[in-house]
Amino acid sequence: MLPTVFIVSDGTGITAETFAHSILSQFDQKFRLVRVPFVDSLEKAYSTVEKINEAAVHDGRRAIVFTTLVDSVSNDIVKRSNALVLDMFQRFVEPLEQELELKSSHAMGRGHQNADTEEYKTRIEAINFSLAHDDGQSNRNLSEADVILVGVSRSGKTPTSLYLAMQYGVKAANYPLIPEDFERGKLPSALTQHREKLFGLSIDPQRLSEIRNERRPGSKYAAPENCRYEINESEAMMRREGIKWLSSTHKSIEEIATTILQEIRLERQSY
């Protein structure tokens, strides 16, 4: 029976879930994850406790709860459940209040109340830009890009571009390197005037073949020898052109994005 882990929040729960994943990944154990977002009333807090207690009875062991509930009354209700409750706000906010000699607002969802802020507008603009400039769809306004990701097809360019846009408000375009580019031995002409904005992604050829086979099984596009050729050529081109690059093979999207921000020295515009 897998231990049950609850992610309880008065908002989306993204913060609590990210923290929970970081902690749980330290253990060689699988977990059953239950997300309980928008617990913004006492009624919902009591309902959450019922779910937690039912899981404890079913599993024959206490549940594990990661919580970011700001309301102290709701928090106290959840803490009475049959669970190990890991309260992120109590753990971090109270020591900060003491250190800063300043009371926190204890306002629910304050971290996400940004719909009218410049950060939110910047993020939406970045998302629209990244979608419009995905996979070399458009060369218009490439000069507005903060970064242009290059690499062979299925090397992780699209998810990384969108993550940079959604998480940090970075205008990230991405452009594929294709066999015709390797035959010419040159970057696509649309990219040459934006060389300082280029960042490359590569990937292990075997892993690339596996990913491409899911999309087009048995094709030349997915063949191991073709994948090796494309990766070798793309890495040679990036070295020749002086383009910074990394392998996405064993890295999460978060790690890739953070590395890119560090390498091109972009400020994180949103959080």
Curated annotation (Swiss-Prot):
Function: Bifunctional serine/threonine kinase and phosphorylase involved in the regulation of the phosphoenolpyruvate synthase (PEPS) by catalyzing its phosphorylation/dephosphorylation.
Enzyme class: transferase
Family the entry assigns: Belongs to the pyruvate, phosphate/water dikinase regulatory protein family. PSRP subfamily.
Protein name (database record): Putative phosphoenolpyruvate synthase regulatory protein
Family annotation (NCBIfam families): PRK05339.1 (NF003742)
Reactions catalysed: [pyruvate, water dikinase] + ADP = [pyruvate, water dikinase]-phosphate + AMP + H(+); [pyruvate, water dikinase]-phosphate + phosphate + H(+) = [pyruvate, water dikinase] + diphosphate
Residues annotated to bind ADP: 151-158
EC identifiers of the protein: 2.7.11.33, 2.7.4.28
InterPro entries, sorted: Kinase-pyrophosphorylase, PSRP
Keywords per UniProt: Kinase, Nucleotide-binding, Serine/threonine-protein kinase, Transferase
Single GO MF descriptor: phosphotransferase activity, phosphate group as acceptor
Species per Swiss-Prot/TrEMBL record: Burkholderia vietnamiensis (strain G4 / LMG 22486) (Burkholderia cepacia (strain R1808))
